[in-house]
């Protein structure tokens, strides 16, 4: 239920969310607490806050209140990248208030991405810059049809011009469709060179690369680098020939490489994730890899991916930490996003945990039957309601 008051009244809060259970992993909070917003930020969190001082009140009784979600792998450059989707209706409206575009734009296209997408969207958009200068423009020509497309100097120049938005360097390594045989593993090493020169990490899409195994990729990865699509079921995966997690995976995790889900249309396999988790391997971050080829399934949105990890046995706190506090640290915005601490930017989501049977399908057409589903019913961006299914 939502109540609004005369906008002319002098109120302490622009918005008050009351009676919900706050889950804020950054502060180890899982408790019934009210959250108040003013001037685009969180201003107070307490057991009870005065309803009379709020211009708008949302009653979240029986629901969970979380920081706005952070999705570290999406593709939101519509009209230029063949993967691109509109960020606001597909990400923000479904609870991902901050997203990281994972290489849709390269050095040649990033200025347009910034001007025509990032700066006009309500979704907060950051980026991994593709080492391929043209980015992910077409399905017909791979990013590395020629090795020259991996341009270190152009990548570094663009990073210097847009350091406020660019978090790292993205490289996709799938042979034939993305990387020609003549390019081989050159794009990986050029991405490493550019990232090192810029002092930033790399994000790697590893599947079916021009190498013997994932070992060859992981050996060039350092602390803070991101291996996305970590539970894919293709060649260059985390499972060895004996059906166990590769030793190189354990070693990489030990030295601080970030293993990210990046579900996508072809990069999440139930048998792989189940095998990995049975050996204690968990993703550091949960992301959707949401794009035009999976927004209508099997991904749908980030909340659906979270539901899959609830089915796998993670707790609500474990699931939400991987889309709030942990990615906030990786993008160096831990005091602004990924938390509802007073002073943080006013992004929040109200979730219902619906007890219902649901079919959860991976990227290979295999399904599991879940018994509960996370549904975002209200999204708050910059302290104001963006979407609200709880309106009176």
Features from the language model and the residues they span:
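Histidine-rich, glycine-flanked metal-binding segment
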Residues: 3-66
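Divalent metal-coordination and catalytic microenvironments
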Residues: 20, 35, 40, 62, ...
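Hydrophobic faces of well-ordered beta-strands that scaffold small-molecule active sites
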Residues: 68-74, 99-101, 125-129, 167-171, ...
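C-terminal cap of metal-dependent C-N hydrolases
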Residues: 20, 345-391
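Metal-cofactor-binding active-site regions of metalloenzymes
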Residues: 94-100, 104-105, 120-147, 170-173, ...
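Active-site core of metal-dependent hydrolases
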Residues: 174-276, 281-296
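His/Asp/Glu-enriched, well-ordered alpha-helical/loop segment
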Residues: 271-353
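Metal-associated gating/positioning segment near the N- to mid-region
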Residues: 59-120
């Amino acid at each position: 239920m939502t109540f609004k008051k005369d906008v002319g009244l002098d109120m302490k809060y622009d918005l008050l969310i009351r009676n919900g259970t706050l889950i804020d992993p950054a502060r180890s909070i899982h408790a019934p607490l009210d959250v108040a917003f003013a001037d685009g930020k969180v201003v107070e969190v307490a057991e009870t806050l005065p309803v009379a001082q709020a211009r708008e009140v949302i009653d979240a009784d029986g629901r969970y209140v979380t920081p706005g979600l952070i999705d570290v792998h999406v593709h939101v450059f519509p009209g230029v990248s063949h993967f691109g989707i509109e960020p606001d209706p597909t990400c923000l409206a479904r609870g991902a208030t901050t997203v990281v575009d994972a290489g849709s734009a390269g050095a040649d296209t990033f200025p347009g991405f910034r001007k025509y997408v990032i700066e006009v969207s309500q979704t907060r958009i950051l980026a991994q810059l593709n080492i391929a200068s043209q980015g992910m423009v077409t399905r017909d020509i791979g990013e590395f049809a020629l090795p020259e497309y991996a341009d270190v100097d152009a990548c570094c120049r663009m990073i210097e011009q847009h350091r406020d938005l660019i978090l790292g360097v993205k490289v996709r390594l799938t042979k034939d469709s993305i990387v020609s045989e003549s390019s081989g593993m050159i794009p990986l090493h050029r991405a490493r060179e550019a990232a090192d020169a810029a002092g930033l990490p790399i994000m790697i899409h590893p599947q079916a690369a021009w190498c013997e195994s994932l070992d060859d990729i992981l050996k060039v990865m350092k602390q803070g680098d991101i291996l996305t699509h970590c539970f894919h079921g293709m060649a260059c995966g985390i499972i060895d020939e004996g059906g166990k997690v590769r030793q190189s995976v354990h070693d990489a995790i030990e030295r601080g490489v970030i293993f990210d889900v990046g579900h996508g249309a072809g990069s999440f396999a139930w048998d792989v994730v189940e095998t990995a988790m049975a050996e204690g391997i968990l993703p550091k971050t949960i992301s959707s890899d949401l794009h035009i080829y999976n927004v209508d399934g099997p991904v749908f949105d980030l909340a659906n991916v979270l539901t899959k990890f609830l089915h796998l046995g993670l707790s609500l706190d474990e699931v939400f930490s991987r889309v709030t506090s942990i990615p906030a640290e990786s993008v160096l915005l831990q005091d602004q996003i990924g938390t509802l601490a007073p002073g943080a930017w006013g992004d929040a989501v109200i979730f219902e945990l619906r007890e219902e049977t649901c079919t959860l399908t991976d990227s290979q057409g295999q399904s599991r039957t879940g018994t509960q589903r996370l549904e975002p019913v209200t999204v708050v961006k910059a302290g104001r309601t963006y979407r609200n299914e709880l309106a009176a």
